[in-house]
C-alpha cells in the first residue's frame, strides 16, 4: 500500500484531495458501546458531541468512530482506535483490583487487534494519585504501578480531564485518528466496466 501525506488518500488508484477527506469526515459518527450505563450523565455526554452517535456492541473500549467512504462503504476505527472512559480514580482502582482479570483481557483483545486505546480518566490527576485522593484500599504506589504497567504493556495513553471536557476530548481524539487512518487507507477498486459487461446489462 502506498503511504500518502495529509493531502491525499488512495481511492481505486486515484488520489483523493484534502477537501475530499474533509468531506468524508463530515459523515463521522461516534460509536458508543451499548454496555455504557444509560444515565443522565451519559445522555448529556452523547448529546454534547458535535456529530452524530450510535450505540453498538464493541469488542473493547467504550467509544470509537466510523465514517461513510465516497464509494458508500463504512470505515470503522473499532479495531484500530478506542477510548476507554473512567469516571474517576476510584473506578480505575476497581478495574485494577476486583475486575483486574476482565480489564486485562479487554486490553489483551485490543493488543491482539493492534489497536490504540486512550484511557480517559475524569476528575483525576497524577498528583491526586500521589496524594491518595480517592476512595479505595489500593495504595498510591500500587495504583501508579498498575497505570505505568499498562502504559508499558499496551499501546495506550492515559489522559486526565474534568468531566465537563469528556465529550469534546473524545470527539477530538477520534476525529484526528480518523483523519490519519483515512490518509493511509486504500479503498477497494471498483470493477472496471467493459463493453461486454455493458452489453450484458442491456440484455438483462
Task: Describe the predicted segments one by one.
Residues 81-87:
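Conserved catalytic cores of phosphodiester-cleaving nucleases, focusing on short active-site segments
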Residues 1-78, 90-204:
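Non-catalytic C-terminal interaction segments of nucleic acid-processing enzymes
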Amino acid at each position: 500500500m502506498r503511504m500518502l501525506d495529509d493531502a491525499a488518500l488512495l481511492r481505486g488508484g486515484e488520489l483523493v484531495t484534502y477537501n475530499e477527506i474533509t468531506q468524508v469526515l463530515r459523515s463521522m459518527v461516534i460509536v458508543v458501546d451499548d454496555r455504557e450505563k444509560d444515565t443522565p450523565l451519559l445522555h448529556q455526554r452523547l448529546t454534547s458531541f458535535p456529530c452524530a452517535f450510535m450505540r453498538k456492541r464493541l469488542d473493547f473500549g467504550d467509544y470509537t468512530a466510523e465514517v461513510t467512504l465516497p464509494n458508500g462503504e463504512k470505515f470503522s476505527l473499532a479495531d484500530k482506535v478506542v477510548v476507554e472512559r473512567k469516571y474517576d480514580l476510584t473506578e480505575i482502582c476497581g478495574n485494577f483490583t476486583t475486575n483486574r482479570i476482565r480489564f486485562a483481557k479487554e486490553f489483551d483483545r485490543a493488543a491482539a487487534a493492534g489497536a490504540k486505546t486512550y484511557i480517559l480518566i475524569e476528575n483525576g490527576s497524577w498528583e491526586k494519585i500521589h496524594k491518595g485522593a480517592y476512595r479505595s484500599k489500593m495504595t498510591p504506589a500500587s495504583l501508579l504501578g498498575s497505570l505505568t504497567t499498562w502504559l508499558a504493556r499496551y499501546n495506550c495513553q492515559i489522559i486526565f480531564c474534568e468531566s465537563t471536557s469528556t465529550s469534546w476530548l473524545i470527539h477530538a481524539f477520534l476525529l484526528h485518528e480518523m483523519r490519519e487512518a483515512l490518509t493511509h487507507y486504500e479503498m477497494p477498486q471498483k470493477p472496471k466496466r467493459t463493453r461486454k459487461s455493458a452489453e450484458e446489462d442491456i440484455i438483462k
